[in-house]
From Swiss-Prot:
Residues 1-85 are annotated as: Disordered. This is Uncharacterized protein M1. Residues 11-23, 56-77 have a biased composition (Polar residues). Residues 24-42 have a biased composition (Low complexity).
């Protein structure tokens, strides 16, 4: 998985920031100067871009307005919804892993 993360980080700064955020040991913290990303594995703080702060605020405000999933669908249990989302996540992760492996192979062939 480490090689996969390195390849993903090489793609672009935006995707690198996404890869860092998705690591299991990362956390988001706030300070008086605005939101900052705390990479707990290295102990360093990287300021989020203005665009990142704006989108984070927008997603937070829209989440508060959404009703619970059980209220939206009426009779579907949350367990079924969770299983559907988990299957979708596994499929998406598998596709992303395959794509990144192909990218790493392509880059290694060029060298």
């Amino acid at each position: 998985m480490t090689g996969l993360m390195k390849a993903f980080q090489k793609l672009s700064p935006t995707k690198r920031q996404y890869a860092e955020i998705t690591q299991s040991n990362s956390s988001i913290s706030s300070s008086s100067s605005g939101s900052k990303y705390n990479d707990s594995s290295s102990g360093r703080y990287t300021p989020l871009s203005e665009e990142g702060r704006t989108s984070a605020r927008a997603s937070t405000s829209t989440q508060a307005q959404k009703p619970a999933s059980s209220q939206q669908k009426g009779g579907t249990s949350s367990r079924e919804d969770e299983q559907k989302l988990l299957r979708k996540l596994q499929t998406t992760f598998g596709e992303a892993s395959n794509l990144l492996n192909e990218y790493v192979d392509m880059r290694s062939r060029k060298k």
